A protein has these predicted regions:
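Sec-dependent N-terminal signal peptides
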Residues: 4-13
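Short, polar/acidic, helix-capping and beta-turn segments at strand->helix junctions
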Residues: 19-174
Length: 174
């Protein structure tokens, strides 16, 4: 019993410290990232749906005008894997923007649960995970362990507006 109480007392300050230092928005600022205003949906849907403690985020591309050559094109014939990685990162920033709009404060994130990443791909290309790492790496940089998630990374023949990446996400929140 004494050992249990001692362990509880030793761990309690660490738990409260980690809760105090968890500040995803400060981390974004450290990374030089400013969240944009979320785009309006382009059809009859919403960007995020909260049910209970889960937020389901619709498929997102990079925020802003989709008719930009810098975010369009197939991997690897029109965009390199490295360019795809950066576009996936931009897509993740847009997802975080919609998530913040839905929940108000990114400190409410308990866990990034699932990421579904789609890459506009040439036939035979099989390195989609290397592209979607752009989003996954950002989520871990912003949320730490809470950002580690289950994931699918798949190739697509077509994506809306010829964008290079489209990503969906499920997040557990307080």
């Amino acid at each position: 019993m004494r050992t249990f109480l001692l362990a509880a007392l030793l761990l309690a300050p660490a738990a409260s410290l980690s809760a105090q230092t968890f500040d995803p928005e400060a981390r974004l600022k450290e990374l030089g990232i400013t969240l944009p205003t979320p785009d309006k949906p382009v059809a009859n849907y919403v960007k995020a749906v909260r049910t209970g403690n889960l937020v389901f985020l619709a498929g997102h591309g990079p925020c802003g005008d989709f008719n930009r050559p810098d975010i369009q094109g197939r991997v690897p014939s029109q965009k390199s894997i490295e360019q795809g990685y950066e576009i996936a990162k931009l897509t993740a920033i847009c997802l975080l923007s919609s998530l913040k709009q839905e929940i108000g404060d990114l400190k409410k994130v308990k866990r990034v649960v699932k990421v579904f990443g789609m890459v506009l791909s040439d036939q035979g290309f099989d390195r989609q995970p290397s592209v979607i790492n752009g989003a996954s790496d950002l989520f871990v940089k912003v949320f730490g362990e809470r950002g580690k998630h289950a994931r699918s990374a798949v190739g697509m023949y077509a994506l809306p507006f010829n964008i290079t990446t489209e990503i969906e996400m499920i997040v557990e929140v307080e």
